[in-house]
């Protein structure tokens, strides 16, 4: 699965359509982290071919309700019909209600405290939870220290809540070592690196190889 980041990344709404459809053609699921929890930010990526959305800074029931209304058709929501890549081959409009995924991003103590209620009420609509470690650390007064005791406690509590509701749980991670660490502690969704980071790594690898000729 590929996550396209419209909140902090180099993608923007005008250039994700072709990229999403390329992913569709090679059967690579693509999730779009939207800029904010508003209808036009959530609905449009699905029209352009995204397989789901990730809602950043989720810490209220109203945000979850807005997300569901913005991406689901009747009887679950109020999404409008349209877009060049809304439907996959063989789908009808109601298939989208079960085939497009909603992930919420927990990035604060407020979000952690409300997560059980969110998953109790809307668990049938939420595919999984992604932790935003940097924003969470900053909001807890930890700076960018995402491995301090306070953060480890917060992350573990989030994992426990997701396991209670049998929901996928993951986090943005710096590398495979961090992914392995959290895999052993219950996570099953690993958002590793960025498109620019991967590009830089591959450029460095190719340069090193050429320099060895």
What role is predicted for each listed range?
Residues 46, 119-122, 183-184:
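Non-catalytic positions within long, well-ordered alpha-helices that form the structural scaffold/packing
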Residues 2-4, 30-34, 53-55, 102-106, ...:
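Hydrophobic faces of well-ordered beta-strands that scaffold small-molecule active sites
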Residues 40, 50-128, 133-138:
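Conserved anion-binding
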Residues 19, 61-77, 143, 196-213:
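C-terminal helical cap(s) of enzyme catalytic domains, especially alpha/beta-barrels
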Residues 79-88, 100-110, 150-213:
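C-terminal alpha-helical cap/extension of soluble enzyme domains
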Residues 12-35, 39, 43, 47, ...:
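Alpha-helix-loop-beta-strand connector modules within alpha/beta enzyme cores
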Residues 6-10, 58-60, 193-199:
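Short, acidic/turn-prone active-site loops that include or flank metal/cofactor-
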Residues 1-18, 131-149:
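Glycine-rich, proline-tolerant flexible connector loops at the mouths of alpha/beta enzymes
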């Amino acid at each position: 699965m590929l996550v396209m980041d419209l909140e902090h990344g180099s993608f923007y709404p005008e250039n994700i359509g072709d990229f999403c459809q390329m992913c569709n053609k090679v059967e690579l699921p693509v999730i779009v982290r939207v800029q904010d929890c508003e209808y036009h930010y959530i609905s449009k990526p699905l029209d352009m071919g995204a397989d789901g959305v990730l809602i950043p800074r989720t810490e209220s029931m109203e945000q979850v309700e807005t997300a569901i209304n913005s991406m689901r058709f009747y009887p679950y929501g109020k999404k409008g019909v349209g877009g060049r890549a809304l439907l996959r081959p063989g789908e009808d409009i109601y298939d989208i209600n079960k085939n497009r995924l909603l992930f919420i991003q927990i990035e604060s103590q407020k979000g952690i405290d409300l997560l059980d209620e969110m998953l109790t009420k809307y668990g049938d609509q939420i595919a999984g939870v992604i932790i935003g470690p940097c924003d969470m650390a900053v909001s807890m007064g930890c700076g960018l220290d995402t491995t301090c005791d306070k953060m480890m406690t917060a992350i573990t509590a989030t994992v426990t809540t997701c396991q209670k509701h049998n929901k996928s749980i993951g986090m943005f991670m710096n590398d495979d070592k961090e992914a392995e660490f959290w895999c052993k502690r219950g996570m099953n969704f690993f958002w590793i690196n960025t498109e620019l980071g991967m590009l830089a790594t591959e450029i460095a690898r190719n340069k090193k190889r050429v320099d060895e000729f």
